[in-house]
UniProtKB/Swiss-Prot annotation:
It is found in: Nucleus. This is Homeobox-leucine zipper protein ATHB-X. GO terms for cellular component: nucleus. Residues 66-125 bind DNA. It comes from the Eukaryota. The lineage of its organism: Eukaryota, Viridiplantae, Streptophyta, Embryophyta, Tracheophyta. CDD domains: homeodomain. Its main location: nucleus. GO terms for molecular function: DNA-binding transcription factor activity; DNA-binding transcription factor activity, RNA polymerase II-specific; transcription cis-regulatory region binding. Residues 20-68 are annotated as: Disordered. Residues 26-48 have a biased composition (Basic and acidic residues).
Length: 206
């Protein structure tokens, strides 16, 4: 990391070890310099910056000074790897060896392919969960908005008569105070009428 004397910003440079030394690097022994203030210019630089493990061919593993190439799979190899991943997301050492032998790949290539495939699968699952949560949040937000409108409408209504509700002990029917008063008057009239009838009957008997 170097500080430029004529600049107010830091000139940040990092060195990342490469897999094979390049002749143009001199005595850096396979170290590559990147300015983290700038975006990577090439796909290769981007992979170096994020620390991605490149896919390599075993034919170039022993060639000194030669840059390793990315692994290019055939359609059949890709199909068989996908089928194997569907059955098992993680391979046992024996499964990895058998699959590498069958596909004419190295065990390291198969292992790296499965690592990358698991990472893509996890990322896809996370994106689906995020989309689901966004939709659920939108639904809850809309439901909350409707409830708020209903609350405001209820608050705007004029309060009804504040008559107390009571329950009739005989019929167990809930009535308000006005009904109770009218019922009491009616019951009083009936009792008074019955009393008069009883008195008149007693007088006639005498």
């Amino acid at each position: 990391m170097a500080l430029s004397p004529n600049s107010s910003s830091l000139d940040l440079t990092i060195s990342i070890p490469s897999f094979s030394p390049s002749p143009s690097l001199g005595d850096h022994h396979g170290m590559r310099d990147f300015d983290i203030n700038q975006t990577p210019k090439t796909e290769e630089d981007r992979e170096w910056m994020i620390g991605a493990t490149p896919h390599v061919n075993e034919d170039d593993s022993n060639s000194g000074g030669r840059r390793r190439k990315k692994l290019r799979l055939t359609k059949e190899q890709s199909h068989l790897l996908e089928e194997s991943f569907i059955q098992n997301h993680t391979l046992t050492p024996k499964q990895k060896k058998d699959l590498a032998t069958f596909l004419k790949l190295s065990q390291r290539q198969v292992e790296v392919w499965f690592q990358n495939r698991r990472a893509r699968s996890k990322l896809k699952h996370t994106e689906m969960e995020c989309e689901y949560l966004k939709r659920w949040f939108g639904s809850l937000k809309e439901q909350n908005r409707r409830l708020q409108i209903e609350v405001e409408e209820l608050r705007a209504l004029k309060p009804s008569s504040t008559s107390a509700l009571t329950m009739c002990p005989r019929c167990e029917r809930v009535t308000d105070a006005v009904d109770n008063d009218s019922n009491a008057v009616q019951e009083g009239a009936v009792l008074s009428s019955r009393s008069r009838m009883t008195i008149s009957s007693s007088s006639s008997l005498c």
